[in-house]
């Protein structure tokens, strides 16, 4: 996946056909973004926010939509926190070229020490306080 178009998905033509994409059930959508359940959830409720159009502005809408969704879950006390992220490039773990944002619910006790959050993508760098 050294092709720049594969590493930076919002620079490619938007892929209408999502066959082979890492999402399953459509759970919500608005004018700019579709929300799917992740096929390989990290935690219960792991969602993918997929822009409908190939523009960086709509990618920003996907990020904003994910944050708003997470905030609602916090206010409703369904989640205790959340992680938000993207994998861009093979070195970052990107396995498909569809642009999407991961919203991963977190609950107290779902791991012994969550300090560092997303920094755990490289386990020995995760807890920067040790």
Language model feature labels by segment:
Residues 1-130:
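HIT superfamily nucleotide-processing domains
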């Amino acid at each position: 996946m050294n092709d720049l178009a594969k590493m930076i998905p919002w620079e490619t033509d938007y892929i209408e056909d999502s066959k082979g994409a890492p999402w399953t059930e459509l759970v919500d959508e608005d004018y700019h973004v579709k929300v799917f359940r992740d096929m390989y959830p990290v935690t219960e409720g792991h969602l993918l926010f997929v822009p409908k159009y190939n523009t960086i502005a709509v990618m920003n809408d996907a990020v904003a939509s994910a944050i708003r969704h997470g905030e609602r879950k916090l206010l409703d006390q369904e989640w205790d926190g959340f992680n938000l992220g993207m994998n861009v490039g093979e070195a970052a773990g990107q396995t498909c070229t569809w642009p999407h944002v991961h919203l991963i619910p977190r609950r107290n006790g779902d791991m012994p020490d969550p300090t560092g959050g997303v920094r755990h993508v490289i386990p020995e760098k995760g807890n920067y306080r040790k």
